[in-house]
């Protein structure tokens, strides 16, 4: 995909309902550097996770803290995909705040289009050392918007009067009604998701 088209390599880890475990990250990196031929292999350079995941599951604060600690130990950035961040923050049982997200990663982004914005996402860089040459890289990849202020205006609105939180909460509440309606009809969810991502297996008939 887009990552490998830019010259990087995607290295996969085991997933548990869409999530990765800190011990798997630790084992992968430690085993990599324990190999005498590691200089001839693709080095792990960043950890990419999603909150919530593609299954709608969410990481606990403890899970994020553990993953963050491993990344710090091995000096690799932690990137959190927040395309549906608002729905994760609004999920019942979530103990992670927006401030926690900022404290426990190097870069994350706040999804816009999946919460009602017309276009764009807001990238939040928490590690200033990663900003070197960031603007030239944006231009190099053809990603510099001519009227970027219009993107920013959307987030100014979303983060006024708790709109971002209200939109997220409403979507999750509606999803829970749909979830309960399916369960009442005898269908079981593929995973237990408390976000607006709900997946059920239905018979072909």
Map each language-model feature to its residues.
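Conserved PLP-enzyme active-site core in the AAT-like
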Residues: 1-205
